[in-house]
Amino acid sequence: MTEEIGYPKFLKDTSVNKLKDNIYCGNLTDSWSIGGAVNGGYSMSIAARALSDFLVHKDPLSITGHYLSVAEPGPVELHLEKLSEGKSISNASVKFIQNGEERIRFTASFTDFEKSKGDTLYEREALKFPPLEECIKL
């Protein structure tokens, strides 16, 4: 059996389930841990998945994390609170709870990029990468 890697694994590892209107659950895997502590960006991705389902605006515009204590591999509960909802942006907070203790507090603004109007301006040239076969494999 080959080890699952890449985007499909990330989608699986960041999946959440809705328990109640504003409460979601997930499972932190040790695949995204360093020294027993779960990576903060991985934790933030789980919060973003829950927020995208919870809010009317589905695309993250800004997410901030306040890391209160170390999150560890295992079950997690996410308690979401909508702070405001406008035509183009929703704001919310997430309490990231393990074993009854709040580990992380996220605040976020979400939007809907499909409804954006106007031109998109790219001021930088796209990055150039070597062919995939020349990249380092882990």
Question: Across the structure, where does each feature detected by a protein language model lie?
Answer:
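Terminal targeting signals and extreme-terminal segments of soluble enzymes
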Residues: M1-L138
